[in-house]
From Swiss-Prot:
Gene assigned in the entry: dnaK3
InterPro entries assigned to the protein according to its UniProt record, in alphabetical order: ATPase_NBD, Chaperone_DnaK, Heat_shock_70_CS, HSP70_peptide-bd_sf, Hsp_70_fam
Designated name of the protein: Chaperone protein dnaK3
Pfam families on file: HSP70
Feature: compositional bias, Basic and acidic residues: 643-653, 661-694, 711-724
Record's compositionally biased regions (Acidic residues): 740-749
Gene3D superfamilies registered for this protein in UniProt: 3.30.420.40, Actin, Chain A, domain 4, Substrate Binding Domain Of DNAk, Chain A, domain 1
UniProt-recorded Gene Ontology molecular function terms: ATP binding; ATP-dependent protein folding chaperone; unfolded protein binding
The entry's keywords: ATP-binding, Chaperone, Nucleotide-binding, Phosphoprotein, Stress response
Amino acid sequence: MGRVVGIDLGTTNSVIAVMEGGKPMVIANAEGVRTTPSVVGVSKTGERLVGELARRQLVLNPRNTFANIKRFIGRRYDELTDESKRVPYTVRRDPEGNVRIVCPQLSREFAPEEVAAMILRKLAEEASRYLGEPVTGAVITVPAYFNDSQRQATRDAGRIAGLEVKRILNEPTAASLAYGLDRRDNQTILVFDLGGGTFDVSVLKVGNGVFEVKATSGDTQLGGNDFDRRIVDWLAEQFLEAEGIDLRRDRQALQRLIEAAEKAKIELSGVSVTDINLPFITATEDEPKHLETRLTRSEFEALCEDLLERMMRPLRRALKDARLQPQDIDEVVLVGGSTRMPMVQQLVRSLIGREPNQNVNPDEVVAIGAAIQAGILAGEVKDILLLDVTPLSLGLETIGGVMKKLIPRNTAIPVRRSDIFSTAENNQTMVEIHILQGERQLAEGNKSLGRFKLTGIPPAPRGVPQVQVSFDIDANGILQVSALDKTTGREQTVTIQGASTLSQEEVKRMMKDAELYAQQDRQLKARIEKRNRAQTLIAQSERRLREISLDFGLYFAESKRRRIESTIRELKDYLERQDDRGLDLALAELQDALFDLNQETAARLRDEEGEGFFEPLKQTFASLRGDGNRDFERSWDDRGGDRWDADPWDRSRRSTPSYGYDDRRSPVSDPYRGERWVEEQTSMSRREPVRDRNGGNGSVRPEPAPRRGRPTWEEDQPPRRDRSSQPPAKPASGRRWNDGWDDDDDEWF
């Protein structure tokens, strides 16, 4: 059982949220950002990019990068305005009159639903990565003024993305859920939603867990992008007047203008003037051209006066349909990033007479509300009742091309309405039912949702047969129409699908294509990650070899180092040849070789640490065992001897008597006078003096003499004795050793 999430599929940005611990939480994408650009692109290598990666190539690859897809979803080509068609990529009409997006890189065309499905799949994958479990269902939000065509197209996009669309939710309603979740007092809320490509106004009654939509209105062809286009046109006209070049005819220059306009719009929300600098915007045969100008907030507001007037009409209509006055509104909730513009906030203040509530994040509040609705459907959130409405009137065409409304706008859903119709001619055996959506009186001025025929009507005079037509709208706002001949009982039922511009066969084909391309994308991503991992491991291995050479020398672990160097050469060769199989083997081999080298290095470090830090402990334990004489010190002693030599005090190992210091002799300044030397077991080591404080019987070990540093061989120091019977060489003529030895002890030799 997978998780159900809430998705705000926006024109400019999209957001995904989920219920965690009973509270909604927005999920950040792989880039660490909570909003994902609603942009899809195809790179020059054929890789499909979604989000920020696609947005980065808008200027360099405008023909293969698609933004603002939400404006085309669920619409036919003839319904598009000239403004919406003015995009850097190619939008064309297919033989059925639907909108198709041309992708030159892949030499194919995409339906807007397919492009939207790529965005939804990207969001679902990010949520699955965060949650650690698959995401199978979603509540997707749409503008409240979306017609049935656009709602059905959004549902199809979710199906193509591999998601079960649990609910299609109006964006203002979702925002009210997020705003009023913890509020128990009765309030009247006005939600002002100005997104990147759509505009909605909804009036709701909120209290005690009940969210009742009273009225909704809007404009699906008005949004923040229209404000950007005003700046684009202003910049293009200025440049055309100064240089005689229309930048709107150049795809790359147009995209740079769009990005500069969006940046200027954002900056003017916080400052009163902004500078626009676009170097090398174009070039002539003589020289490159630059665009440098300054735009003030007052000039920007003057450019957008007509857009503000277009927003006033839906706002007043929503209040009128709800039978409310501006003073009846308790709270105004702003939704959408474009509501940050000061002129929009001032418009709300002037019409409502109340300061807008800015406690909610306008970019995330819709996704949070969608997550709450997902929690309601999953049983995680209780005691909440949502009563939504249909945004537009629904009816059918009658005699004379007049629209007969069966369900008026702002009717609470789900709802079912019926009416009785008859034939227009004598002996008519078939009637065609034409479903319409809109507010115009004539059928041709409204949106056609579809047609179907009811056949088998018995011949009869005009007006005698009775045909009952029923309209049924579910909680998602999806319409189902049925026609019943009351004479014969013959019934014809149809779910309106023509609104989506896609047949069921096309939807299934796109679902298979999306899964196929998703698998190809995963394989390509895995190859790229493998190559990156190999390059990273090569760099780490080379750095490790350099460090070991500096720390332990060139001859340390020579065989293991040669193995690593050889594997690195093989790995680089596989990378150059793009041999995936060899790359896997070389990667595993290099990891094993590096592990072996690190093990040997760690062992060497442990040995060195043991000789240093743990040496005093070793000496202590050795002295407790009684064998510490030999390991007492490793440095030179005061007589020039090495403490690691054989123990000269152990009389049990030889029969040679030892001699001690003669206390009976008068003290002399010579430190070696009066001492006796014993023969050592190693001929190459120096003699150790033995001084006995108890009369020379050797029963008590003398205390060591204080250190005097490492001795140097002077004339007054004793020579190295040889155990052989040969006497030492005589000194040079005129010189004699002052060794302090008793000449009477000739038996020593």
